[in-house]
Swiss-Prot record:
Region (G4): 136-139
BP term (GO), one: translational elongation
Protein name, UniProt field: Elongation factor Tu
Reaction equation(s) it catalyzes: GTP + H2O = GDP + phosphate + H(+)
InterPro entries: EF-Tu_GTP-bd, EF-Tu_GTPase, EFTu-like_2, EFTU_2, G_TR_CS, P-loop_NTPase, Small_GTP-bd, T_Tr_GTP-bd_dom
Record-stated family: Belongs to the TRAFAC class translation factor GTPase superfamily. Classic translation factor GTPase family. EF-Tu/EF-1A subfamily.
Major subcellular location class: cytoplasm
Metal-binding in keyword set: yes
Transferase listed as a keyword: no
Coiled coil, from the record: none
Length: 399
């Protein structure tokens, strides 16, 4: 049988399952593929196939993640599921699997548990825009009132973390019963997917966002000017446009007089392209690796931020010893290392933390020695002598 060509006619959305261990995330993932497979929208995947997730590396960290894909009438989905709690934490913080929305799985028999709370907090911190809830194991709850209580509890918990708890769609069902083929429960899976279709927004495409390119290298071409090279992270750039050069030194403007890719001249470069941009009115010494070229006004330089960070264990190549306030590692942002001082650490409940151990997840306040173009939701690595000792995401800009 010839392989079907991938038709990009439907909107593409990245989602994932999150929630407490053993509440049924992987079973639900399997149930979605099996239920949609009957409608021709997926390849059925068994629990065992999904659970045996391959290892992958993101920002120097090994993570186990399973990727499945399926489609509904209106959309094509890429869905991530992680076997272990630590994998979720690492995945969400590194952004290895970017999520446009997530399905929070809560066992109706147990209600919200510690990791339910932790995953909701993480979703908020790393910028997952919308959640839909699946109350699993409904077949194990005889009392309708109990089901309503769990639903209320979940809605309150979501509101605690600034998600719109009253508006979030909650669908009750049983992933296992759906896999076993019971109609009522297969219908609940379809109802869940309808909620995901309707409630989780289609993300803005990278190419439609404001232009940004991190500078990787700079050289001058005699008689023509200065060229900055790098990969366009988002948006597009045309010959003749004015751009800002942001970070390290004072922000300044320049005009793009040429866009080149693989020795060919282009009219415009777009997200994903590796290009050289010829800039007018800029000397080679005015621009360096670590700066970004961006649409004027779209990004600003900052020195102080809060980050949600996963600190590598020593088995993962991280530090062997704890660290404290005023620790000064390098923060690897986009294309460059910037030294910064970690001023303080905070636990999930807002209390101050004195000492951070390898393997911890922690919120930290960082002050960089140079202003860099950073924004909320941006990923970074923490390095010491060239090796990665942590991964983080900017949760809040302070100044």
């Amino acid at each position: 049988m010839a392989r079907a060509k991938f038709e990009r006619t439907k909107d593409h959305v990245n989602i994932g399952t999150i929630g407490h261990v053993d509440h049924g995330k992987t079973t639900l993932t399997a149930a979605i593929t099996m239920t949609l497979a009957e409608l021709g929208g997926a390849k059925a995947r068994k629990y065992e196939d999904i659970d045996a997730a391959p290892e992958e590396k993101a920002r120097g960290i090994t993570i186990n993640t399973a990727h499945v894909e399926y489609e509904t009438d209106s959309r094509h989905y890429a869905h991530v599921d992680c076997p272990g709690h630590a994998d979720y934490v690492k995945n969400m913080i590194t952004g290895a699997a970017q999520m446009d929305g997530a399905i929070l799985v809560v066992s109706a028999a147990d209600g919200p548990m510690p990791q339910t709370r932790e995953h909701i907090l993480l979703a908020k911190q790393v910028g997952v825009p919308k959640l839909v809830v699946f109350l699993n194991k409904k077949d194990m709850v005889d009392d309708e009132e109990l089901l309503e209580l769990v639903e209320l509890e979940v809605r309150e918990l979501l509101s605690d973390y600034d998600f719109p708890g009253d508006d979030i769609p909650i669908v009750a069902g049983s992933a296992l019963k759906a896999i076993e083929g019971e109609k009522e429960y297969k219908d609940a899976i379809l109802e869940l997917m309808k909620a995901v279709d309707d409630y989780i927004d289609t993300p803005e495409r990278e190419v439609d966002k404001p232009f940004l390119m991190a500078v990787e290298d700079v050289f001058s071409i005699t008689g023509r000017g200065t060229v900055a090279t790098g990969r366009i992270e988002r948006g597009k750039v045309k010959v003749g446009e004015e751009i800002s050069i942001v970070g390290i030194k004072d922000t300044r403007k320049a005009t793009v007089t040429g866009v080149e890719m693989f020795q060919k001249t282009l009219e415009e470069g777009m997200a994903g392209d590796n290009v050289g941009l010829l800039l007018r009115g800029i000397q080679k010494e005015d621009i360096e690796r670590g700066m970004v070229l961006a649409k004027p006004g779209s990004i600003t330089p900052h020195t102080e931020f809060e980050g949600e960070v996963y600190v590598l264990k020593k088995e993962e190549g991280g530090r062997h010893t704890p660290f404290f306030a005023n620790y000064r590692p390098q923060f690897y942002v986009r294309t460059t290392d910037v030294t910064g001082t970690i001023k303080s650490y905070t636990a999930d409940d807002g209390s101050a933390v004195e000492m951070v151990m390898p393997g911890d997840r922690i919120k930290m306040t960082v002050e960089l020695i140079n202003p860099i173009a950073i924004e909320q939701g941006m990923r970074f690595a923490i390095r010491e002598g060239g090796r990665t000792i942590g991964a983080g995401v900017v949760s809040k800009i302070l100044k």
